[in-house]
Amino acid sequence: MFPIRNTVPTRYPPVITWVLIATNCIAFLFEISLSPYELEQLLYQFALVPARYSEILASDEINPVIDDVLPLFTMMFLHGGWLHLILNMWTLWLFGPTIEDRLGHSRYLAFYLTCGVVASVAHIFFNPVSIVPALGASGAIAGVLGSYMRLFPLARVVVVVPILFIPLFFEVYAFFYVGFWFLMQVLQGMLDLAVTPTRADVAWWAHIGGFVAGFALVPLIVQSERRYRAYYRDEGVLGFDPEGRM
């Protein structure tokens, strides 16, 4: 299933989502402008290398400096290829505006970064000796998906399912689409631990950590109905679609 439309209407322009997408794209364009050696140095400095933190925790004196903390944030603005970037930004573009609309711009930015950091910590915890740099916005975006499922479990997501090269379009409930995605992350994460406990090519546990953070945190910071408006879990009330048509 590939999502192509989020049917929940929004009221305000998603300024922070636009900024996040632009920042990720600019960072990626900078990445591909580098030589292979320069790119390797960039990734080992600003992407997330779990073994680095295991060494810090194993030392007698834990005294983290800015170079140790920075990758927890910067890793979520780096990507490993065009497809990696496009899939992440597409998902953020579909679901980010809805959550930004409900949280407000400043809260949404803090929420997004927090989910990204929790995702980084989860990846370190489950892959403590990995020397493979982890990078990508998917952990933070997983937090957006978790919050979307929490706030609008009965919202409809339009997805396309290609069967024998024929695209079929369906409307599914958010709890089904996002829940299925989360279940796949858990299964893949468990399989990864069982098969390759010292190496993680995909940061499954970062996705899981970000999702759980988003699902748990969003009720605490969502705007009250007095500041926004009353809204429903599906937003499909009174027989109107998001454009106001019957």
Where are these regions (language model features)?
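A detector for small-residue-rich transmembrane helices and their helix-helix packing motifs
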Residues: M1-M246
